[in-house]
């Protein structure tokens, strides 16, 4: 469940069927999530009274409500502390920022800002932790991941690392660590493992897992905000890993994986001594369900690779010819 779901359950348990607030910012997003986030952060408490903007618990505007979430003394987050503690921390380890160029650092900061926006859709600001780098965001900041782990003492910690041996299947953890790494120059491959080695050397127990799409990391979005959203869709929304990846995946990332799949599934034929590679039109239908592509992407990638898209009947004939040739040899 997302924070707003927990908040609605809590309000219902108090026989509160609507909520209002005085902040105009509530109109910019999901109003219940906005109020829930400020309640969880301790900025709002719930009191008797009428705010400027009123909503039912589905987030629909109503004329008035006798309860207001605002800067007052009333029902506080302390009453749902146990439920709030069940939400995971997303920790971005920026200890390797010294390896980044100025351009990469700017990209890292942008990704962190977008990550906060993602966290706000599912949880609240203090569930995002930035370690090893100061930012202008309202996330929690620590000098190091080690400082955070010593203070919060999470029981289960998972480091998301594309080079890990174990696969992430949606395991629940108290803390997910993501490497604050932007690699535009190609000189940081495998550096997330340095974070794992450092934490283990410093006496911390953690698991190391990779997110894969049908057995391969290719096609899995690698931006920090995208990884965060995939994880939260899985662990809070209960979404399957492949579906979460598909929801977050953009077409550029999808085309990278598509090229791999075309290379694996195309066939080599010879026509009058000239070699060609072909692939059936129906292959598009095989991948469109888990790669966010359209037909234009399919034909474009095949063309760039020198692969000819043919009717499936022709591909079947070519396959039979190849089998016959193999048998004759």
Predicted regions and their residues:
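Structural alpha-beta junctions
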Residues: 111-129, 145-147, 198-208, 289-297, ...
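S-adenosyl-L-methionine/SAH cofactor-binding core of RNA-modifying enzymes
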Residues: 117-187
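Short coil/turn segments at secondary-structure boundaries
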Residues: 104-105, 171-172, 187-192, 314-315
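A structural/positional concept
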Residues: 64-139
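Structured adenosyl-cofactor binding patch, chiefly the S-adenosyl-L-methionine
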Residues: 194-257
């Amino acid at each position: 469940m997302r924070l707003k779901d927990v908040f609605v359950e809590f309000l219902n348990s108090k026989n509160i069927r609507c909520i209002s607030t005085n902040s105009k910012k509530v109109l910019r997003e999901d109003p219940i999530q906005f109020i829930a986030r400020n309640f969880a952060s301790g900025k709002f408490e719930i009191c008797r009274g009428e705010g400027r903007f009123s909503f039912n618990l589905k987030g629909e505007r109503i004329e008035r409500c006798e309860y207001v979430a605002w800067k007052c003394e009333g029902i506080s987050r302390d009453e749902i502390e146990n439920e709030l503690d069940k939400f995971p921390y997303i920790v971005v380890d920026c200890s390797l920022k010294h390896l980044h160029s100025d351009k990469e650092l700017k990209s890292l900061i942008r990704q962190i800002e977008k990550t906060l926006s993602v966290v706000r859709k599912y949880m609240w600001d203090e569930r995002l932790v930035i370690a090893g780098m100061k930012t202008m965001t309202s996330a929690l900041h620590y000098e190091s991941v080690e400082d955070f782990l010593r203070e919060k003492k999470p029981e289960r910690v998972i480091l998301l690392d594309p080079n890990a041996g174990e696969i992430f299947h949606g395991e629940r953890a108290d803390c997910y660590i993501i490497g604050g790494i932007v690699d535009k120059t190609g000189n940081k491959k495998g550096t997330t493992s340095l974070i794992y080695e450092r934490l283990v050397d410093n006496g911390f127990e953690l698991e190391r897992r990779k997110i894969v799409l049908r057995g391969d990391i290719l096609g899995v979005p690698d931006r920090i905000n995208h990884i965060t959203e995939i994880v939260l869709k899985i662990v809070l929304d209960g979404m399957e890993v492949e579906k979460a990846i598909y929801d977050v995946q953009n077409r550029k990332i999808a085309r990278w994986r598509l090229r791999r799949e075309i290379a694996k599934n195309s066939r080599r034929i010879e026509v009058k001594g000239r070699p060609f590679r072909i692939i059936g039109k129906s292959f598009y239908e095989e991948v469109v369900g888990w790669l966010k592509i359209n037909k234009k992407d399919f034909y474009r990638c095949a063309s760039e690779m020198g692969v000819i898209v043919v009717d499936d009947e022709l591909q079947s004939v070519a396959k039979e010819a190849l089998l016959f040739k193999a048998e004759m040899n």
